Amino acid sequence: MGSLPSPNDPSNTFNPMDLTELSTESKLVVDFITQYYQTLETRPVQPRVKPGFLTGQLPDKAPFHGESMEVILSDVNEKIVPGLTHWQSPNFHAYFPASSSNAGLLGELLCSGLSVIGFTWSSSPAATELENVVVDWMAKMLNLPSSFCFSGGGGGVLQANTCEAVLCTLAAARDKALNRVGDDQINKLVLYCSDQTHFTIHKGAKLIGIRSKNIKSITTKKENEFKLCPNDLRDAIRSDLEAGLVPFYVCGTIGTTALGVVDPIKELGKVAREFDLWLHVDGAYGGSACICPEFQHYLDGVDLVDSISMNAHKWLLSNLDCCFLWLQSPNALIESLAAEANFLKGGSEMVDYKDWQISLSRRFRAIKMWMVIRRYGVSNLIEHIRSDVSMAVRFEEMVAADDRFEIVFPRKFALVCFKLSSEKTPPGRDSELTRELMERVNSSGKAYLSGVQMGRIFFIRCVIGSSLTEERHVDNLWRLIQETAQSIVS
């Protein structure tokens, strides 16, 4: 194909891997991205567009003849970029970050450029072995027990996201339970989480055939900091056992989405061991912080855990996508997900990652994460997280010092949850006015915050996490919030 002449014009040879073009056009793209980042701070964080804005600007049929990279990038700049929510903006504080870095971006380029598919060891040996190395490196950075490392009998895999990681562990736990009680008992399988657990667990449970009524969300309480209570979990398990059901899985979290709650891993682990349940820990957000020694106490009891996942693309500068999943005993996962086709067999004692994930094809994510760790070192990754936490502490202190506001939940990482004070707003209107405050801030284009409705309370979430955010951006955000509140609260 690369050297096949055009039937209409033999002198025109189509070569999709023209290396001269690659060198020239990649520079155009890198320059475009650089300019985008240079202007990012001045752009409205959220786009001011309406549904269908892009459809009307693009042709309804694909171009028959190719176009130049210059023309394509011009359309990206004029038609695509104005409709983006700028997740890398230093003023983006709505959701947990999709962290970006030079090394992550260039590692992504290497991943795409090498374009290997390491579904078995033999299909690309270096891809598999580098992934083995990287997941062990990260396990040691988190100070996980050696039993989670390949060198200690466990192991890990890089998934695309937490949804896929959780789904894999659910499938493994389901099959492990059914091997014990029989396949005909699948409708009796029950899993447990808290009402603060990410909806990923509900989605994954449905995909593996768990009935909705058997997904038990245990109510959390403010006086217990909204943690999943081990005693409540134990009571729920006992009740279900008495009803003839089969408890098989529990999910704890390090850094929930709404509040940043950290569940008591050690105590949950004891309950899981008592009743032979699979315990998974979702560390999608807060897990990354545990490379810092001051946060590693949140992992106390992790030796009682069957699996743990963490999104490096949230806080460890890897760019999307990169999710670590570790298991103490990978065999249950492999037995559940193994592909048996003869042509897929690796024929070696090495890991075949096709048996550690849902899909067969897989990206060379390890080279990107390896590049990030090597380029910055553990010390700079720790400093990056500490810097974000420090700015979050600064923001929290400014909010707490203004009597028009109140902190909803004690900050654990770099998420600050706050609202207008009920004492400074008309009776019963604090949530309504807090929502109005958030909407006005967001509509200004100068910042982007998110909100949560929890019971009758509405509060604002402010996450510090963009790689470009500096103290001045946090100070500017606080001034914007104060000025906006002035027109809402007298």
From Swiss-Prot:
Reaction catalysed by this chain? Answer: L-tyrosine + O2 + H2O + H(+) = (4-hydroxyphenyl)acetaldehyde + H2O2 + NH4(+) + CO2
Q: Please outline what the protein is used for in biotech or industry.
A: Yeast engineered to express 4HPAAS together with Pseudomonas putida DDC (PpDDC), Beta vulgaris L-tyrosine hydroxylase (BvTyH) and Papaver somniferum (S)-norcoclaurine synthase (PsNCS) accumulates (S)-norcoclaurine, an important precursor for the production of benzylisoquinoline alkaloids (BIA).
Q: Which organism is it from?
A: Rhodiola rosea
Identify the CDD domains for this entry. Answer: DOPA_deC_like (cd06450)
Question: SUPFAM superfamilies per the record?
Answer: PLP-dependent transferases
* EC number, UniProt record: 4.1.1.108
A GO MF annotation of the entry reads: pyridoxal phosphate binding
Q: Which GO terms describe its cellular component?
A: cytoplasm
Name of the featured protein: 4-hydroxyphenylacetaldehyde synthase
Q: Which residues, renumbered to this chain, carry the PTM N6-(pyridoxal phosphate)lysine? A: 314
Tell me, in a sentence or two, what this protein's role is.
Catalyzes the production of 4-hydroxyphenylacetaldehyde (HPAA) directly from L-tyrosine, tyramine not being formed as an intermediate.
- Identify the keywords attached in UniProt to this record, alphabetized: Decarboxylase, Lyase, Pyridoxal phosphate
